[in-house]
Amino acid sequence: MALENPKMHNSEISKRLGAEWKLLSEAEKRPFIDEAKRLRAMHMKEYPDYKYRP
């Protein structure tokens, strides 16, 4: 979406992607949810003392 609309603000891209995400079925969302869990576990293993500090 960002490549197709290079001048679109990030907030608008996020809003549109969120709307598209809500339209997906659980089966369509599952691969993304599983990958997020896998990456989270990998990050926790590689960086056990990591603390988010904005």
Swiss-Prot record:
<dbReference type="InterPro" id="IPR009071">
    <property type="entry name" value="HMG_box_dom"/>
</dbReference>
<dbReference type="GO" id="GO:0005634">
    <property type="term" value="C:nucleus"/>
</dbReference>
<dbReference type="InterPro" id="IPR036910">
    <property type="entry name" value="HMG_box_dom_sf"/>
</dbReference>
<dbReference type="Pfam" id="PF00505">
    <property type="entry name" value="HMG_box"/>
</dbReference>
<dbReference type="GO" id="GO:0007420">
    <property type="term" value="P:brain development"/>
</dbReference>
<dbReference type="GO" id="GO:0000978">
    <property type="term" value="F:RNA polymerase II cis-regulatory region sequence-specific DNA binding"/>
</dbReference>
<keyword id="KW-0539">Nucleus</keyword>
<keyword id="KW-0238">DNA-binding</keyword>
<protein>
    <recommendedName>
        <fullName>SRY-related protein AMA3</fullName>
    </recommendedName>
</protein>
<dbReference type="GO" id="GO:0001228">
    <property type="term" value="F:DNA-binding transcription activator activity, RNA polymerase II-specific"/>
</dbReference>
<dbReference type="GO" id="GO:0000122">
    <property type="term" value="P:negative regulation of transcription by RNA polymerase II"/>
</dbReference>
<dbReference type="InterPro" id="IPR050140">
    <property type="entry name" value="SRY-related_HMG-box_TF-like"/>
</dbReference>
<feature type="DNA-binding region" description="HMG box">
    <location>
        <begin position="1"/>
        <end position="51"/>
    </location>
</feature>
<dbReference type="GO" id="GO:0030182">
    <property type="term" value="P:neuron differentiation"/>
</dbReference>
